[in-house]
Amino acid sequence: MLCTLCPRRCGVDRDVKQGYCLSPSTVRLARAALHFWEEPCISGTNGSGTVFFCGCNLRCVYCQNSEISGGEAGIPMTDDEVMQTFDRLIEKGAHNLNLVTPTHYADSVARILEKYRSLVPVVYNCGGYESLDTLKMLEGLVDIYLPDFKYADSALAAEYSNAPDYFERAGEAIKEMNRQVGVLKLNDDGIAERGLIVRHLVLPGAVSNTKKVLRWIKETLPEGTVVSLMSQYTP
């Protein structure tokens, strides 16, 4: 597979060597468990069924999960093993299947979800640096998009994530996510069923970047779009 799943478009044959994401073509999972520290409408009372994929197409310098994003953690999984992992999380009462950093495995994710057809909402929890072609491949398979929108400032994006085109790529990706799933919808218990939640982490000394991101959201996305503003930056 010559990989073009994300905007980096490495063109690397991941059956032979790793690309920027430091990941082979075979899915590697680092952790799968109920998680209670997502947004309240995602975690609810039972927890979110989080599935952490190894590797990352951004690898931000301030990453809180660097052991996972570095690509070395975890174990390889077949499609059947991934689906069995999903089953175990649902049996534990997970409100959803929360796929964390799945971008560089999106082709495998699409193939698995085509076969699996989850009984609970599927959350695509990503860094926002996405390819339109990849997102269109996921249409109808993802119920909730939970992207970061990290940067409107290309200099920050280059310095911290080696992605100077982040704003352009994330902007078009989030518009596509909104087209697919629309404004967030909750059930009677306040649990997310479908829609878009945009996350943004405020970076130290970069309030102007945050203002630009929020302005873009206000001017570009529908009224009622849910924004999760975060402050847990860790140096």
Predicted features and spans:
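Conserved AdoMet/S-adenosylmethionine-binding subsite of the radical SAM
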Residues: 84-235
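N-terminal [4Fe-4S]-dependent radical SAM core
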Residues: 2-61, 65-72
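Short acidic (Asp/Glu) patches
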Residues: 34-37, 81-83, 126
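Hydrophobic alpha-helical segments
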Residues: 36, 68-71, 78, 157, ...
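Glycine-rich active-site/cofactor-binding loop and its immediate structural neighborhood
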Residues: 54, 60-95
